């Protein structure tokens, strides 16, 4: 029996990253392998006693080793009690200067803390090969296992057939960190809102709107083309909890996934594509890593290579409802390999290998 300790800082509340990378995969893992693994959750291990820690075989943490900004002290304690630890990363450990959280991360020494945790970890788990190579090349961590994000449809991402308004409903959802990505669609949306042939045939929904956030207001301005959209063309789905946000997809036919091609974005995960696929939505997506390996243009998506493609492909889908059906059906098939039961199994096998080395 493997005794696993999972550190979820937001526990008992669950943040988005903790939900996808820690809570859900280990929840499913405990069901699949209940006779082989015992999982305990805790929100920090800095204050844990040696006696408590000695009862476990492996501890898993996301990004940071310490909640009290003293990672070296925690690393030394884990070494002292002989408890190996795994750091899970689903995006870059360095924030670009134009990132909305850059200065907060700089003030908190996040890059240094994550680097220290990764360098000293028994192993790391990451979402894809590019991020794994980054950690090996820059931080010297060679013991890395690729464990992608997954979706567990039961409960939060179940298929539903919503009642639409006779229009094609496009939608974008995401956090305020994606403002620069959303801007890629502005010109195309502006043209669409004002095109006589199309302006009454579609609607755009902004998922994750945060009323009190100035950046969220800026995203709303972009998606509505600075108010050019009228009430029949634009709507919002307000920010909600991790167990409810999947309901956004029930309001749309087509998921819009813009992403600028830069280091930080390339090291992110393909989660939005997976969410859209499991909710059986057609997708228009930037042809940018980490999405590009899963994209098949005209088969399971429409790939955007230039900002003008947003208008081109949105009108294409308005004109071709059968293509919407074909794309969403194929993407649903293609993402099934990312079902959480498969991903949780991959993660479990990684843990066994780590402990057997």
Predicted regions and their residues:
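N-terminal pre-catalytic "stem/leader" segment of glycosyltransferase-like enzymes
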Residues: 1-66
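Conserved catalytic-core segment of nucleotide-activated headgroup transferases in glycan assembly
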Residues: 8-28, 152-157, 163-250
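Active-site proximal beta-strand in glycosyltransferases
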Residues: 78-96
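Membrane-proximal helix-turn-helix segments that form the acceptor-binding/catalytic region
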Residues: 80, 104-124
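Donor nucleotide-sugar binding/catalytic pocket of nucleotide-sugar-dependent glycosyltransferases
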Residues: 119-136, 140-158
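Nucleotide-sugar-dependent
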Residues: 180, 232-275, 284-295
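Conserved acidic donor-binding segment of nucleotide-sugar-dependent glycosyltransferases
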Residues: 295-308, 315-322
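A charged, aromatic-enriched C-terminal amphipathic alpha-helix characteristic of glycosyltransferases
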Residues: 305, 322-355
């Amino acid at each position: 029996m493997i005794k696993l300790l999972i550190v979820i800082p937001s526990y008992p509340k669950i943040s988005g990253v903790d939900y996808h990378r820690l809570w859900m995969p280990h929840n499913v893992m405990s069901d699949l392998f209940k006779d082989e693994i015992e999982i305990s959750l805790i929100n920090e291990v800095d204050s844990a006693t040696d006696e408590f820690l000695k009862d476990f075989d492996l501890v898993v943490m996301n990004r940071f080793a310490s909640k009290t900004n003293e990672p070296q002290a925690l690393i030394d304690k884990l070494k002292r009690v002989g408890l190996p630890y795994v750091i899970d990363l689903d995006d870059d450990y360095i924030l670009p200067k134009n990132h909305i959280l850059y200065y907060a991360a700089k003030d908190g020494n996040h890059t240094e803390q994550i680097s220290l945790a990764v360098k000293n970890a028994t192993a790391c788990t990451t979402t894809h090969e590019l991020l794994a190579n980054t950690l090996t090349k820059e931080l010297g961590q060679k013991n890395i296992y690729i464990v992608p994000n997954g979706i567990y449809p039961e409960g939060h991402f179940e298929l539903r057939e919503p009642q639409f308004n006779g229009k094609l409903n496009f939608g974008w959802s995401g956090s305020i960190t994606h403002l620069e990505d959303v801007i890629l669609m502005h010109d195309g949306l502006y043209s669409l809102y004002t095109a006589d042939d199309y302006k009454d045939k579609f609607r755009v929904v902004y998922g994750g709107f945060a009323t009190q956030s100035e950046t969220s207001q800026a995203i709303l301005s972009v998606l509505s083309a600075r108010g050019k959209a009228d009430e029949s063309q634009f709507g919002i789905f307000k920010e909600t909890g991790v167990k409810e946000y999947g309901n956004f997809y029930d309001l749309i036919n087509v998921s819009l996934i813009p992403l600028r091609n830069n280091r930080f974005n390339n090291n992110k995960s393909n989660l939005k594509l997976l969410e859209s696929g499991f909710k059986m939505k057609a997708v228009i997506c930037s042809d940018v890593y980490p999405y590009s390996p899963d994209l098949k243009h005209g088969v399971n998506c429409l790939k955007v290579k230039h900002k003008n493609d947003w208008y081109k492909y949105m009108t294409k889908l308005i004109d071709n409802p059968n293509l919407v059906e074909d794309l969403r059906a194929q993407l649903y098939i293609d993402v099934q390999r990312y079902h959480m039961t498969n991903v949780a199994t991959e993660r479990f096998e990684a843990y066994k290998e780590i402990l057997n080395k």
